[in-house]
Amino acid sequence: SNAGLWGYEIGDVVRFVSVDPYRIIVVGRTKHFISAFGEHVIGEEVEYSLQQACQEFSVSVREFTVAPRVSKDQEKSCHEWFIEFDQPPADLHAFAQRVDSYLQQKNVYYKDLISGSILSPLQIQVVPKGGFINYMRSIGKLGGQNKVPRLSNDRVIADVLISFTSFN
């Protein structure tokens, strides 16, 4: 029955996996996106891109979040990824290139902004182990019911996480 759907908070993005019978899976939240430059990147695309690169480089991620970085000088704007790895990849630059490549495959608007030299490819900031826990503790939201948003269309989380990264 559809009784369970009435308990859903509006804002979930769902995908139908079957129409007979009707079956859906939750693939994200409408408020978790980045479109600071018109790219309309959603959580499903980001998670896919990161997962593929992690498999390719044999690394695992504890936690991550992504935010836009709007440049105020000659440098182009980009997406800034804050990632806490179990063990970082040996070649972080190559890893970032693969994540970016997968994201371009999934999102044509993002690809157009990169190929049109509007945006620079994404940049990764490595968050030391425990960095996200420290962040959640610092905002009073440490606990199982609270999660770090994967995507933010602003820099509220990113600006705090900068102080926890190994590359300031």
Language-model region placement:
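AMP-binding adenylation
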Residues: 1-168
